[in-house]
Amino acid sequence: MAIHADTHDDLRLFQTGEHACGYWSDRRARDLVLDPHDPRLGAIYPQALAWGFRRSGDLVYRPHCERCRACVPVRIAVDAFHPDRSQRRCLTRNQDLVVRVVAAERTDEQLALYRQYLKYRHPGGGMDEHGATEFDQFLIGGWSHGRFLEIREPAIAHLPGRLLAVAVTDVTEHALSAVYTFYAPEAAARSLGTFAILQQIQWAQRERRAHVYLGYWIEGHAKMNYKRRFSALEAYDGRHWCDLPAHPSGT
């Protein structure tokens, strides 16, 4: 299978075999994957985001399940975004934190936080055994133009504050893509996942980028409900991006 990549050639697509669904335990999933060996992959990636694809490591994929279309690509049109009351409270609650964008280069501190998060969120699932190699393969990859958005406690005596969260973010000419966010489990009350997205939106606004891609939203899935709380949300129907009105409860 191939898709039109430019005026000269096509980019090959591969379909994976069926595998366990990462969202519904009673379903099977499969994906479309852009040719990972194509040297143009980095150049075509911005367009692939607009086609509903997503990056994991060096793979750019999109769900393509035989009997399920639950995974809906979503993005935020940042110029039209306005935080709701809950999101404003989140910003206020975390105004003491220090946010900075750094190179996508693993540090021991980031790796320790990543492993702590996986043990909390995915105990016994295999991911909780990830080390430095898996960190680099999953989050950084070999060709992506990524950055790490770090969220820290305030500095103490000119030393950096404790690292609370990292939002792995891909940067393209016109958009940011939220790849993965991990945070200190004991700081869950701060809603750092939501706070990270709000910071990515502000980052995109500062740099005049049009969208922040949030990956996939699944209607009725508890872990995906938070995405519906964001205004200016758009969903991809396979051909076009359409407005998806925010829902205060996220359902």
From Swiss-Prot:
Coiled coil: none
Compartments where located: Cytoplasm
Domain of life where this protein originates: Bacteria
InterPro entries with a match to the protein in the record: Acyl_CoA_acyltransferase (IPR016181), Asp_Glu_LeuTrfase (IPR017138), N-end_Aminoacyl_Trfase (IPR030700), N-end_Aminoacyl_Trfase_C (IPR007472), N-end_Aminoacyl_Trfase_N (IPR007471)
Enzyme class: transferase
Keywords from the named record: Acyltransferase, Cytoplasm, Transferase
Xref: Pfam families: ATE_C (PF04377), ATE_N (PF04376)
Biological process according to GO: ubiquitin-dependent protein catabolic process via the N-end rule pathway
Transmembrane intervals: none
GO terms assigned for molecular function: arginyl-tRNA--protein transferase activity; leucyl-tRNA--protein transferase activity
Catalytic activity: N-terminal L-glutamyl-[protein] + L-leucyl-tRNA(Leu) = N-terminal L-leucyl-L-glutamyl-[protein] + tRNA(Leu) + H(+); N-terminal L-aspartyl-[protein] + L-leucyl-tRNA(Leu) = N-terminal L-leucyl-L-aspartyl-[protein] + tRNA(Leu) + H(+)
Main subcellular location: cytoplasm
GO cellular component term of the entry, any: cytoplasm
E.C. code: 2.3.2.29
HAMAP family linked to this entry: Bpt (MF_00689)
Annotated family: Belongs to the R-transferase family. Bpt subfamily.
Job description of the protein: Functions in the N-end rule pathway of protein degradation where it conjugates Leu from its aminoacyl-tRNA to the N-termini of proteins containing an N-terminal aspartate or glutamate.
Name this polypeptide is given: Aspartate/glutamate leucyltransferase
Organism the protein comes from: Xanthomonas oryzae pv. oryzae (strain PXO99A)
